[in-house]
UniProtKB/Swiss-Prot annotation:
Disulfide bonds: none annotated. This is Methionyl-tRNA formyltransferase. Belongs to the Fmt family. GO terms for molecular function: methionyl-tRNA formyltransferase activity. It catalyses: L-methionyl-tRNA(fMet) + (6R)-10-formyltetrahydrofolate = N-formyl-L-methionyl-tRNA(fMet) + (6S)-5,6,7,8-tetrahydrofolate + H(+).
Length: 312
């Protein structure tokens, strides 16, 4: 069985690694073009490309994947199966029709919930307690194809998007492995998705990280977790942008004498801030002029006053 693997970020690497370790014939990898990264804006290769080259696998990086020329290039390679994992672009019907076994996708949610580009982030931001991996046959819609296998994963109360991402990437490879075993044995069962139960997880932008202190304590805590490590939750103090990397919910009642966003106390434990229904403790922060640090380390050389208001 000849396989073409399509993926781009770190999430996809364990799935590709599994294919290699299990002896599958990966004849090519399709990944997105190198992109400028960091302050120097030097071109950086996608993690999937780096991994593929380390293992001597042919790498294709088309700027556009829907052109007749690229579809023909895939057809000439003669794959039996396409496998996608966080590739980042919708695949055309012409390409989906090339492999006789179709295209299997590894998706980071329990479909039909959280279709789209950022299911891991949004599952935390929205306060989900459980998420998981779904393998599916890809169709021309956005994560709308028939489901194959599902496996759940618990989201702990303080888990960040980065931590969940790493666990989901490993789980994705495991579920893909089982899916391919069923495919070879002819025991795959396809389950259509119920569109009435679907939800959408749009791409995460930097603006998503802006903290609204009029939200509940739990909502603010979830936003901080769900945007860590990217794009990062943030607020403003005296018009300076302050990133908030870690918070904890504290039992401090819900006094009406403080307004949302007000700093109630500052000490080695952290910065206590009022939300609409209670108080949250900022434990780690970062300003543009400094590195990420614990509050106790920051206040040794910098002053943050109680009574100040966070936000614009």
């Amino acid at each position: 069985m000849k396989i073409i693997f399509m993926g781009t970020p770190e999430f996809a690497v364990p799935s590709l690694e599994m294919l290699i370790n299990e002896g599958y014939n990966v004849i090519a990898v399709v990944t997105q073009p190198d992109k400028p990264k960091g302050r120097g804006k030097k071109l950086a290769a996608p993690p999937v490309k780096e991994f593929a080259l380390e293992h001597g696998i042919k790498v294709l990086q088309p700027a556009k994947i829907k052109t007749p020329e690229f579809v023909e290039q895939i057809r000439e390679l003669g794959p039996d199966l396409l496998i996608t994992a966080a590739y980042g672009k919708i695949i055309s019907k012409d390409m989906l029709d090339v492999p006789p076994l179709g295209c299997i996708n590894v998706h980071g949610s329990l479909l039909p919930a959280y279709r789209g580009a950022a299911p891991i982030h949004w599952s935390i931001i929205n306060g989900e307690k459980v998420t998981g991996i779904t393998t599916m046959f890809t169709d021309v819609g956005l994560d709308t194809g028939d489901m194959l296998l599902k496996r759940e994963l618990e989201i702990s109360s303080d888990m960040t998007a980065g931590e969940l991402h790493d666990e989901m990437a490993i789980l994705g490879a495991e579920v893909l492995k089982d899916t391919l075993i069923h495919l070879k044995n002819g025991t795959l069962v396809r389950s259509p998705q119920d569109d009435a139960l679907s939800s959408y997880a749009p791409i995460i932008t930097k603006e998503v990280g802006l903290i609204d202190w009029n939200k509940t304590v739990q909502q603010v805590h979830n936003l901080v977790r769900g945007t860590n490590p990217w794009p990062g939750a943030f607020t403003f103090i005296n018009e300076s942008k302050m990133r908030v990397w870690k918070t904890c919910i504290v039992d401090f009642g819900n006094s009406q004498e403080h307004c949302p966003g007000e700093i109630v106390s500052v000490d080695d434990k952290g910065i206590l801030v009022k939300c609409c229904d209670g108080y949250i403790m900022i434990k780690e922060l970062q300003f543009d002029s400094s590195k990420r640090m614990k509050v106790r380390d920051y206040i040794r050389g910098n002053k943050i006053d109680t009574g100040e208001k966070l936000g614009k």
